[in-house]
Amino acid sequence: MMSAMETNMVLILTIFYNAYFLLAISSQLLLLYLMLKCQNRSLHEMRIYLFNILGLQFISTFSAFVLQCRLKRVTLKHFCRIVPSSGTVAMLCYGPCKYLGNIVCEVLFHILQTSLIACATALIIAFYYRYEMLTNNSFTRSGHYKQLVISYCVPLVFLICEVLSPNDVNKLVAELTVLHPTYGLENYAILGFSDVKTVAASSQTLMLMIGLYGTPFIALVFRKKIIKILHSSRSYHAEKIVQTKSMIQGLTLQTLLPLICYCPGFTYYIYSQYTQSSSLFVEFAVSPYGFVYTIFDPLLTIYYVLPYRRTFKAIFSKHNSTTSATFVHSETARRVA
């Protein structure tokens, strides 16, 4: 049975995840609308990479939400807290997925993790595309697809390592019962890794660390190269320089966001494994941060991709003009009457 503190934390986190889901989907749908509405020629090929990133964010958001249709209320169906134990790590999933069994929750967890890793590689190939366009000024359609295929190789290897990692649920439950007797385990779907010291599990952790800290570093290297090219060349139109600089600034921030969001949870995971300590409050506090960036990522794209920002402003200005015209017309009609 849950303690009073655990019950309150579950309630708070449920409210948080509902708000997160609505905000994330709203920002993603807004970006999708602008991408479909804005037909700027300069973004014709770049849209391939932006659609790829947005699609992965849809997957990472909906993968925790897709089974909700079997319930009557709106709730995010898959959220986890990481619980440390001796040589293992367990995810306690509280949501409708628990009614469908551990296999469903495990599949959803793999989809979440893999799609988030894929988002990082998608940002890197977007940087590479901009760099190639400035240096060679050409990129074939087959080149785009080749880039996309290569970008999914890393997430695929990560997924294989994750699937091959030992996940003896009975061992996890037995260990959790002994080490954390106050946890209401009957209220969760429990999954995780029963031995984090195997080659597969260690490789997965190493790939997480490289992805977490390496992606921003690679992005900053490409950013420096691109800015240097823009400053040294006089053949580019001023508008193209401004637009490229703004887009690169946005992509840079997008690669830094996951680092900021993942750091609390990943740092706690590493700390707990080495110290063999845990905190119920910290487990709940750090669990949501890994997904929060999917709220802000589309907004950064809207702001820093200038054609999308201008399209958004044009729609907003048109709406205000229509509202003002309607008000003036009705006010004039009232006075005449």
Swiss-Prot record:
Topological category with respect to the lipid bilayer: Multi-pass membrane protein
Keyword Membrane (UniProt): yes
Transmembrane segments: 10-30, 48-68, 107-127, 147-167, 202-222, 250-270, 280-300
Localization per record: Membrane
Keywords associated with the record: Membrane, Transmembrane, Transmembrane helix
GO cellular component term, pick one: membrane
InterPro entries: 7TM_GPCR_serpentine_rcpt_Srd (IPR019421), Nematode_rcpt-like_delta (IPR050920)
Pfam families: 7TM_GPCR_Srd
Disulfide-bond pairs as recorded: none
Family membership: Belongs to the nematode receptor-like protein srd family.
UniProt name for this protein: Serpentine receptor class delta-50
Organism name: Caenorhabditis elegans
